[in-house]
């Protein structure tokens, strides 16, 4: 449908080497966008590109560490020369770290400050700030663009144990709204997507035991999710295409779309 056709758009997906970012990258490509897969893991990046091309899409891998501005600048230049100037930016890098996960044996006061800063910067500075600083100005100069930041249900209600991740993702929502306000007059829309619980590398140890059985945390999560299941990575694609499309979401900025199976709607 033309409303969701991204033909002619160039999308940069940072963190496309991961499960969620990879699914979004593939979805944008299937909607017609040329996709730049950015990430640190070259093997995963090339695998994602191969998958996209195998399904008829256009994509290329560009190595980049989202926490290094110079590396992002190098990748930006390469993307522009290879695919064209980006009109869509998806910030999907980030994740929790067991070093900053609160446990009975490691309460909050025992988390090392350097570990806190490392994970906080991964999710906020590298997760949103630096990519927006690098790719945003070119969009504002051209007078068009869409930026999509991946948040988390823990940004709305801090979940137990993942304190640093929750704080950083809450900041992601705040920064998203700030940028939406600042860049709206210049034609750039900035929104976020809040995924619920999607099994991926960074949360697998919290959700499953070594033998593959669900942890007590998983049972609690599913009991609190009205749909009673985890999300599938492909279920983020619809929201991403909607926000990426200048036709479908032309008057949408500063918004957060929850793809959480009703998790944040549940009380008792």
Where are the model-predicted features located?
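Alpha-helical segment proximal to the catalytic Tyr-Lys
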Residues: 137, 181-185, 250
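Substrate-binding pocket helix/loop in short-chain dehydrogenase/reductase
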Residues: 100-120, 221
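Conserved glycine-rich cofactor-binding loop
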Residues: 17-18, 41
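A glycine/serine/threonine-rich, flexible loop-to-helix segment
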Residues: 2, 103-106, 185, 197-224, ...
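Short C-terminal tail/terminal secondary-structure segment
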Residues: 1-2, 157, 227, 241, ...
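C-terminal helical subdomain
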Residues: 123, 127-130, 185, 192, ...
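Residue(s) in the substrate-gating loop at a strand-loop-helix junction
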Residues: 152
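Active-site helix of classical SDR
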Residues: 132, 168, 176
